Amino acid sequence: MNNLIKSKLELLPTSPGCYIHKDKNGTIIYVGKAKNLRNRVRSYFRGSHDTKTEALVSEIVDFEFIVTESNIEALLLEINLIKENKPKYNIMLKDDKSYPFIKITNERYPRLIITRQVKKDGGLYFGPYPDVGAANEIKRLLDRIFPFRKCTNPPSKVCFYYHIGQCMAHTICKKDEAYFKSMAQEVSDFLKGQDNKIIDELKGKMAAAAQTMEFERAAEYRDLIQAIGTLRTKQRVMAKDLQNRDVFGYYVDKGWMCVQVFFVRQGKLIERDVNLFPYFNDPDEDFLTYVGQFYQEKSHLVPNEVLIPQDIDEEAVKALVDSKILKPQRGEKKQLVNLAIKNARVSLEQKFNLLEKSVEKTQGAIENLGRLLQIPTPVRIESFDNSNIMGTSPVSAMVVFVNGKPSKKDYRKYKIKTVVGPDDYASMREVIRRRYGRVQREALTPPDLIVIDGGQGQVNIAKQVIQEELGLDIPIAGLQKNDKHQTHELLFGDPLEVVDLSRNSQEFFLLQRIQDEVHRFAITFHRQLRSKNSFSSQLDGIDGLGPKRKQNLMKHFKSLTKIKEASVDEIVEVGVPRVVAEAVQRKLNPQGEALPQVAEERVDYQTEGNHNKP
């Protein structure tokens, strides 16, 4: 805590208001509210805190405060300040997270559309739906039952949908506006859950079609009835009164909060919203902030009722939401709130379980590996592997794992420069010398452990370079594979010995991931280089074919095989002079296999030119 903060803490009033924490750059990193500014702000700089709060406090170099007349005014101000400044430590709901609605437009001839924007335009909106797929499923069903207008600008002729029975073609039909308004009301009733009338009508039409031997049409009506039944089963009935309501529940544990919102429409649960985030203040107050952001940020229809847990300030929620606010004490509504709370608890428990498994796989694995090898926890592990085929295009690759996870920005590729032929030991010596010679020259942070993809010979080579030539003290281990090319043994120590490592342990799985990753990275680089060298070598020595023209040929034909199959005329089209194109054909088809001069139509199969990209 610096002197500026100390002096400001003495000036804090006991009034309600908002406080604004800033970092060394003057950037707002957290906005909070308090019933008593003095007590709340001082609490950040006194006593111990959990890890996330310690992280926040460590960045605070200044703060400001704004006094308000009431707690509710402070709540509203806090929400606006968060929206305006987007502090990194505050609850932030994504502005672009919106839900789809089905809309009946307020037009002379209404349309049925899906939209994510709710406007005061006289249209009828139904939803929200969990995703656009669910909304489309319902709309497709409605399109089959109700032939609304489909075109934005109706043509003088009938549209495609008219021919498949999904548009009335109002530009030529005799139906008046009242008919379409009546149809809009039927859709409205259907989307409100009042679908029995429509089902009865469809059953009547199905029976009539069957009597007149129109069995295909009768089958269509049957399929529609079944589709409505399927839709009914997907929407769980939550309340008998068929009201539209949002049901809030939350649960807190270990400094984290989960808020669940049930969207109940016409008594049916059609979607839920789940958010998990760390909280820094009183959980009830952070919940209120969440509710304020929820209705402020989202394109969301405010329902008839909002149900909230018992211990939440009802008046504060009323200031945030223009709806009937209830804290149910018993009965069906109380059960809904309890269900939302239960689901919030389950979601939070699942998060912690996943975190524990993640820590076990990463942090726990490196800690166990350090204990097993009797070295400090290997936070940074660098691993090497060589790749070549009969000594051609020899390469090596290094992958880096930090805290048990790949750090791809630190990966490195090496072309072997000093070795002729297939010599894994010499290649390993060169690469280790290049890598750690640079670490030494530039005073880079060395790894906590080097893992060599290889046996005793490669590991000893690495030890010679690291310890004897460069004088560095870095632990080095080796990973040997079995005859099935699977991770088999871990070598470590001086002299090297097989480490007793359980094949079911997380540290074994970590080493396996490292070995698989470095092998993948090395072999991918080798394939890329070999492909490039093969292309270049076969086109080398052709007069008039320089690097630029080679590049243009590869860009156009994608592979050497395609160039070989191309006619002279096709090569000329790429910008290569005819005499050079003929030379290319002679070089690639040396035994009189050159293709005709005139290009013929050919099938352009998908090339494999890019299959080696990582």
Swiss-Prot record:
InterPro entries for the chain: GIY-YIG_endonuc, GIY-YIG_endonuc_sf, GIY-YIG_UvrC_Cho, RuvA_2-like, UVR_dom, UVR_dom_sf, UvrABC_protein_C, UvrC
Molecular-function annotations in GO: DNA binding; excinuclease ABC activity
Domain UVR: 196-231
Start and end residues of each GIY-YIG domain: 14-91
Keywords, sorted A to Z: Cytoplasm, DNA damage, DNA excision, DNA repair, Excision nuclease, SOS response
Intracellular or extracellular location(s): Cytoplasm
PANTHER family according to UniProt: UVRABC SYSTEM PROTEIN C, UVRC/OXIDOREDUCTASE
Quaternary organization: Interacts with UvrB in an incision complex.
Protein name, per record: UvrABC system protein C
Taxonomic classification: Bacteria, Bacillati, Bacillota, Bacilli, Lactobacillales
